[in-house]
């Protein structure tokens, strides 16, 4: 993501091939284009899911090769670009000496020749965005009949790093499993986002329909701290 490609600037502002580099011709630096990328997500995405995906990228990007100050500048430029403040985005890019061979933030280089690539989801929302479910809609989910289905243990990995096994029933919806997790860990259902094989699970999906393999770990992203922490003894 931030690997050095062995390129250098010349006096005209272009990027030339380095005789000892990879032989990749990067082309002339271009001003940032105003057109936003249009893309479609693999699954309909809510605003909250998009924010989480972006946060995950910006939290991990500086861990790759490249300079943190450049990542910070690119994050600020991406925010300005999406907010239609094109002049500010260009000023940030120029101030950090960032080169755009194609006039897009999807491929950038710093003055040392390090390459930085921003995913399109950091620059614009997908064309298949959907609205967040409201609390009123959630109330429409019917309760499963008592003791219906069969009982099993579902392995969860929380965003806090904690692993646990949650006792669930095959007729449970994702929302009811969120309520079970709320009872066990104190995290409100609205603050939980469940993912199976990278796919977000909606509240109305039933466990028996998901066909989650035994011992498969379901990821749970939580947007609030755990409630009622265990007191520390003196």
Swiss-Prot record:
Disulfide bonds listed in the record: none
Pfam family name, one: UBD
Gene3D superfamilies, sorted: Phosphatidylinositol 3-kinase Catalytic Subunit, Chain A, domain 1, Ub domain-containing protein, DC-UbP/UBTD2, N-terminal domain
Skewed-composition ranges (Basic and acidic residues): 32-41
Bias type Polar residues, positions: 9-21
Domain Ubiquitin-like: 152-227
UniProt xrefs under PROSITE patterns: UBIQUITIN_2
Full protein name: Ubiquitin domain-containing protein 2
Natural source organism: Bos taurus (Bovine)
UniProt lineage: Eukaryota, Metazoa, Chordata, Craniata, Vertebrata
């Amino acid at each position: 993501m931030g690997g050095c490609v062995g390129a250098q600037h010349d006096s005209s502002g272009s990027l030339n091939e380095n005789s000892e580099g990879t032989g990749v011709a990067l082309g002339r630096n271009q001003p940032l284009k105003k057109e936003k990328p249009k893309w479609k997500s693999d699954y309909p995405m809510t605003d909250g899911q998009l924010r989480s995906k972006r946060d995950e990228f910006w939290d991990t990007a500086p861990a790759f090769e490249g300079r943190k100050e450049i990542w910070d500048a690119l994050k600020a430029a991406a925010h300005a670009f999406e907010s239609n403040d094109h002049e500010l985005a260009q000023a940030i890019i120029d101030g950090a000496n960032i080169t755009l061979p194609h006039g897009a933030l999807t491929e950038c280089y710093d003055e040392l020749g390090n390459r930085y690539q921003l995913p399109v989801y950091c620059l614009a929302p997908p064309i298949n965005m959907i609205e967040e479910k409201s609390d009123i809609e959630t109330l429409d989910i019917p309760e499963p009949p008592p003791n219906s289905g069969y009982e099993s243990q579902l392995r969860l990995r929380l965003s806090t790093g904690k692993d646990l096994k949650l006792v669930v029933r095959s007729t449970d919806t994702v929302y009811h499993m969120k309520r079970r997790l709320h009872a066990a860990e104190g995290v409100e259902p609205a603050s939980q986002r469940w993912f199976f094989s990278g796919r977000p699970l909606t509240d109305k999906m039933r466990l028996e329909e998901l066909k989650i393999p035994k011992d498969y770990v379901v990821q749970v992203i939580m947007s609030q701290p755990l409630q009622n922490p265990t007191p520390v003894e003196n």
